[in-house]
Swiss-Prot record:
UniProt record similarity statement: Belongs to the universal ribosomal protein uL16 family.
Functional note: Binds 23S rRNA and is also seen to make contacts with the A and possibly P site tRNAs.
GO cellular component, one term: cytosolic large ribosomal subunit
Name of this protein: Large ribosomal subunit protein uL16
Alphabetic keyword roster: Ribonucleoprotein, Ribosomal protein, RNA-binding, rRNA-binding, tRNA-binding
Binding partners and assembly: Part of the 50S ribosomal subunit.
One Gene Ontology term of the molecular function aspect: structural constituent of ribosome
Organism, as annotated: Synechococcus sp. (strain JA-3-3Ab) (Cyanobacteria bacterium Yellowstone A-Prime)
């Protein structure tokens, strides 16, 4: 299963999943993709189950790219432990996914095959997803920061 080789810190805070994905929201490698429609934590086990389902369906044909990586540790306390005495130990790894994020890409297979493989992968995931192709995929607009409004000071006011 996927997990980082080493991290700077063993434990992380939970954080929030606000807004849409600004990175990883374009199809870069294959011809077809699976886009997240909801925010969620996706575990390393779910990613691996999805990958196996796709690989088993396409067999030797085509290529699969996993566009997400579980880099966030989730801690759990041991069973029947009293409150206090610090944070629990890291038990598994998750990937924070926001709406619009490309989860998987596929290439080198017909669209019908890719669509069915992605459908099987989607059943292993805890969120709603959408199948997209490079041809019909609308590019997300780049976020432009508004320029600060400058108010001109009248010369007589100085």
């Amino acid at each position: 299963m996927l997990s980082p080789k080493r991290t700077k810190y063993r434990k992380q805070q939970r954080g929030r999943m606000k807004g849409k994905a600004t990175r990883g929201n374009r199809i870069n490698f294959g011809e077809y993709g699976l886009v997240a429609l909801e925010p969620a934590w996706i575990t390393a086990r779910q990613i691996e189950a999805s990958r196996r389902a796709m690989a088993r369906y396409v067999r030797r044909g085509g290529q699969i790219w996993i566009r997400i990586f579980p880099d966030k540790p989730v801690t759990q306390r041991p069973a029947e432990t009293r409150m206090g005495s610090g944070k629990g130990n890291p038990e598994y790894w998750v990937c924070v996914v926001k709406p619009g994020r490309i989860l998987f890409e596929m290439g080198g297979v017909p669209e019908a095959t890719a669509r069915e493989a992605m459908r099987l992968a989607a059943q292993k995931l805890p969120i709603k997803v959408k199948f997209v192709t490079k041809a019909n995929f609308e590019e997300p607009e780049p976020v432009q920061k508004a320029a600060p409004e400058t108010t001109e000071v009248a010369a007589s006011a100085i």
